[in-house]
Amino acid sequence: MTSTDPSQASADRYVVIGNPVAHSRSPSIHAAFARQTGEAVHYDRLEAPLDGFADTVRRFFADGGYGCNVTVPFKLEAYDLADRLTERAEAAGAVNTLWIEEGLIHGDNTDGIGLVRDIQDNLDTLIEGKRVLLLGAGGAAMGAMLPLIECRPSRIVVANRTASRASDMLEAFVEAADQYGVELWGGGLDALEGLSEDEAVDVVINASSSSLQGEVPPVPEFLLGEGVLAYDMMYGAEPTVFLQFAARCGARVSDGLGMLVEQAAEAFYIWRGVRPRTAPVLAELRAALQAERKV
């Protein structure tokens, strides 16, 4: 376990659990939140064995831990482990935030709300009334759907390599979409070629694994033109290949670093009841990434 602030021996203990987890930026983010708010928080990394996630979590709480963030590959296991789930977690089918309340393990998913706050607050792009294209139908896309719907876009199009998976995912959100007046459409990535320019979108979100594989999703160039925000949930020292392609097409681009900070801020608020300011923390992280890029 790696400590972010060894001087805080009496602080409330939190961790991020994953495998691997040494690369996680969560400790530095939460340490910044703690300094900013004056909260006595001690946040570490904790690597769980691939076959020992539940035992690791239970031991952490039994030893006096207050809460934990969950990263790959354990978000589905965290969903199963939680005794109580928030509406967001149930909709996402995955959990990235755990805490103990009245002796029970509670689970939430803050990824989607982190995404929409980054887009709306940090990137100054209102989602209400807009047309959104979501690339991918895996766990990242599932976690984004309900928070996106709650922002009341006019339409959400989900495009996935396997068309049936996109359709299946949308089935789970028909009721919510009806409640918020959002039109849903889903299909294969190849179906995007059949869209007319009248069906152009305002925001394109890459929630697929393509950037991890160094691949560009087959998105028609006219969907990434001037005035469009192209957003990739991935982030790194260099722009992803998707963002490079989108920028060449004329779109405004952003990676997912702000989403990382915003989902962490939501977890901090759940645990502490205090909402930290994210802008200075995001600026600090962005500067660190730029420094890495120059090395």
UniProtKB/Swiss-Prot annotation:
Pathway assigned to this chain's UniProt record: Metabolic intermediate biosynthesis; chorismate biosynthesis; chorismate from D-erythrose 4-phosphate and phosphoenolpyruvate: step 4/7
SUPFAM superfamilies: Aminoacid dehydrogenase-like, N-terminal domain, NAD(P)-binding Rossmann-fold domains
Domain of life: Bacteria
Stored InterPro entries: Aminoacid_DH-like_N_sf, NAD(P)-bd_dom_sf, SDH_C, Shikimate_DH, Shikimate_DH-bd_N, Shikimate_DH_fam, Shikm_DH/Glu-tRNA_Rdtase
Ligand binding (shikimate): S24, R25, S26, T71, N96, D111, Y235
Binding site for NADP(+): E87, G136, A137, G138, G139, A140, N160, R161, T162, A163, S164, R165, M233, G256
Keywords on record: Amino-acid biosynthesis, Aromatic amino acid biosynthesis, NADP, Oxidoreductase
GO cellular component terms, A-Z: cytosol
UniProt keyword Oxidoreductase present: yes
GO biological process, one term: amino acid biosynthetic process
EC identifiers of the protein: 1.1.1.25
Active-site residue numbers: K75 (proton acceptor)
Family matches, as Pfam families: SDH_C (PF18317), Shikimate_DH (PF01488), Shikimate_dh_N (PF08501)
A GO term, aspect molecular function: NADP binding
Assembly notes: Homodimer.
Family in the record: Belongs to the shikimate dehydrogenase family.
Function: Involved in the biosynthesis of the chorismate, which leads to the biosynthesis of aromatic amino acids. Catalyzes the reversible NADPH linked reduction of 3-dehydroshikimate (DHSA) to yield shikimate (SA).
NCBIfam families reported for this sequence: aroE, PRK00258.1-2
Stated name of the protein: Shikimate dehydrogenase (NADP(+))
Gene: aroE
